[in-house]
Amino acid sequence: MHRRQVSPAPPSQRLGVTPGGLAGAGGELYGRSVKQHVRFCTARDGVRLAYAVQGSGPPLVRVATWLSHLELDWESPVWRHWLKQLGDRHTLVRYDERGCGLSDRNIGDPSVDVWVGDLETVVDAVGLERFALLGVSQAAAIAVAYAARHPDRVSRVVLYGGYARGRRFSGQVREEEAIVAAIRAGWTTPNPAFRRMFSALYLPNGTAEQMAWYEDLLRRSTTAGAAAALYRARGRVNVCDLAPQVCARTLVMHARDDRVVPVQEGRLLATLIPDAHFILLDSANHILLEQEPAWDVFLSEIEAFLGTDARSGLPIGAAGLTARELEVLRLVSEGLTNQSIAGRLCLSVRTVERHLTNIYAKLQVSGKAGRASAAALSVQLDEPPRFPSR
């Protein structure tokens, strides 16, 4: 794990957005037209999952977590800056978790395997081959599990406020049971006192408007029964054995004073993932808010990190090489054998050979000179910012 602490940039250097009104999903956001396309796909057990695609650029898949709503999130002062600013730079794919938002309220028997299966269903429905993953809060563990099981499809992993093990494994069983009981008792009551407990935990530095929106989202995004079942299921999550198998470069960020997921759980997560970068943010909010400096730091860090693969899935240079082919090409230029390249990228030797065949064809080289010519081209290509190699 590579750890560092980041201080907020001075105001003049922060990434900012001019506030504005929102007419709703597909309406005006910050003075610009926002359009998302909501579609449905069917999970293996028949549950219908709602997903949305917006923006353009390299694909970024935000793994689902509880309490989301594809339409309401656009109107929310808690989430709309996430959608706007990430969607400005990427083709942003997100989906409502089973039991939440526009997806079926039937949750079945939720588990890591089920949630990973839902993610598989969504990315296949969208038609993505290779993409970056964003896992926030409970979704971090699912992003880790997917990346470990599908190394050839994940280019980068960004995790915020996440954990590798649920409350059942971190000595917080009593807290979990108390919250589950409170959910069942007060989720839909007219009195907002119960929901205020949640907003105080998740958004301790939120404005009155942000906290009110979040409290309303709790009630509108899912039922009390589904919320309790999903919360309890998250407590049983444990991907500690899968995290060391993640091959994609990974950035882990965590708020220093997070009251929902203690910072030590974020550190543990980063420690378990080989060569992960860990950044501590100066915040107490489990959901980063637009007005706090930590949001600007988060956004700049995520873009710098994903920028190393910003052309993922797009043609690169006149040769039209994909990002994965460029990765193979750079390792060839470092003198690695096909077997070593396969080990570095978590691929089979046969897959590496197929990539090389495609590279040689695009570069119009062949024979013994092919490998040398390809390597020579590699050193001429613009190098992205490098992170420590595995």
Label for each model-derived stretch:
Residues 113-131:
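Conserved acidic catalytic loop of the alpha/beta-hydrolase fold
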Residues 129-171:
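Conserved hydrolase catalytic core segment
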Residues 276-316:
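Catalytic active-site module of serine/aspartate enzymes centered on a nucleophile-bearing elbow/loop
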Residues 361-390:
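Basic, Lys/Arg-enriched C-terminal extension of HTH/homeodomain DNA-binding domains
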Residues 308-330, 385-387:
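Regulatory hinge/linker segments at domain boundaries
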Residues 160-216, 220-231:
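Helix-rich cap/lid subdomain of alpha/beta-hydrolase
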Residues 40-102:
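Conserved HGGG/HGGXW glycine-rich cap/lid loop of the alpha/beta-hydrolase fold
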Residues 246, 252-254, 258:
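Short beta-strand/loop motif that positions the catalytic acidic residue
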